Regions:
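N-terminal assembly/transducer modules of large multi-domain enzymes
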Residues: 1-131
Length: 131
C-alpha cells in the first residue's frame, strides 16, 4: 500500500500559510515597549509549528530559518532580551522570506537566496546582540 503524500504536503502548506498570516498580524499589533506575553507565545508557537512540519518533510532551509527565529523569540519571551523595533522588522522580513521558501517547495518557484542569507545574518546578529 502506497501513501499519497501530496495530501499531507497540502495540509502542511495550508497550515503554514495560516500560521504566517497569524504571525504577521500579531507582529504588526505588538506594543514594542510592553509586548503582551500571550502574543509573544503565539508568535513563538507559530514558528515552532512551521519548524516541526518543515522538518517532517525535509525542508531544511525552512527548518533552519524558523529555528533561528524561534530561538530569538524564546529569549525575548523569557525576558533575557528586550524586544526592539529592529526585532519586529526582522521578524516581519523573516516571515516574508519563509513564505517565499514555502512557495518554492510547494510550487517550485525560485527562492531569492540572497534574501534568505540576509535574514539569517540579521537573525544571528540580533541573537548575539550585534546590531
Amino acid at each position: 500500500m502506497t501513501i499519497d503524500m501530496s495530501q499531507f504536503f497540502q495540509v502542511f502548506f495550508d497550515e503554514a500559510d495560516e500560521l504566517l498570516a497569524e504571525m504577521e498580524k500579531l507582529l504588526l499589533a505588538l506594543d514594542v515597549s510592553a509586548p503582551d506575553n500571550e502574543d509573544l507565545n503565539a508568535i513563538f508557537r507559530a514558528a515552532h509549528s512551521i519548524k516541526g512540519g518543515a522538518a517532517t518533510f525535509g525542508f531544511t532551509d525552512i527548518t533552519e530559518m524558523t529555528h533561528m527565529l524561534e530561538s530569538l523569540l524564546d529569549r525575548i519571551r523569557k525576558g533575557e532580551m528586550a524586544l526592539t523595533p529592529e526585532h519586529v522588522d526582522v521578524f516581519l522580513v523573516a516571515k516574508d522570506v519563509l513564505a517565499m521558501q514555502m512557495e518554492g517547495h510547494h510550487h517550485g518557484s525560485s527562492v531569492d537566496q540572497d534574501a534568505v542569507g540576509s535574514v539569517c545574518q540579521r537573525l544571528k546578529a540580533l541573537s548575539q546582540d550585534i546590531v
